[in-house]
Amino acid sequence: GYLECNKGFITLGKDMGKIVKVPVFVFLIRHLEGNVLIDTGISSRFKETWGKRLNYFIPILKHNIVEYLKDIKINYIINTHLHIDHCENNPFFKDSEIIVQRKEYEIACNPKPYQRLSYPDRVDKNLNYRLINTNLDLFGDETIKIIKTPGHTEGHQSVLLNLTGKKIFIAGDSCYTSENLKNNILPGIIWNADKVMECYEMIRNLKDTLVIFGHEEAKI
């Protein structure tokens, strides 16, 4: 799907007031050890669930992910973080193991007042969460590696894929767009500016890797 929003939320201090449409991604990875979903995106119920967020962000649902994947068993979900546009469909995958950084889960369950706009109103604690505190090679074969990338949020993580010899870095919101990266522009929603810059530098140092930015159109 997409979000319509003020570009100032994407590029802090630049193009404030300009309305843009940015993509919201969900990735399905098929692996011999099981199907993996990276983020779960916006729910078809957003008109009821987003509340005052709709004053700032207008979701445009291209696909109902739950309906689209209804005949596919999802073994694992990797949430880059738990902001509402990345995890709202989590409750529909009750049989999946959801992998998230422990710090991110703890903050999402009890966000500070200034964080509440970004996180869901309620985290379903009955889901099958696997809380981690470090990087993780999901299947031990280096095909799907979870990498801690705090900055946008304290518990943010990204995913490095190495499939059929092609490396792809799913940045999530560690870096919104190539414009942010090129010009060292902070995102409009941020936990720690220094950590964001560390993420940018790490991304620049990736070799022979396609980077999929969190909110920029991409071709794989």
Regions found by a protein language model. Give the residues of each.
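Short, solvent-exposed loop/turn segments at secondary-structure junctions
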Residues: 2-4, 34, 42-45, 84-85, ...
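Conserved beta-strand hairpin/beta-sheet module of binuclear metal-dependent hydrolase folds
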Residues: 2-67, 158-172
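Residues that act as N-cap/strand-start positions at coil-to-secondary-structure junctions
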Residues: 21-23, 132, 153-155
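Hydrophobic/aromatic beta-strand patches that form the interior of the parallel beta-sheet core
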Residues: 36, 78, 99, 130-132, ...
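Metallo-beta-lactamase
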Residues: 43-44, 58-85, 97, 101-150, 191-208, ...
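Short, conserved loop/helix-junction motifs that constitute active-site signature segments
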Residues: 91-94
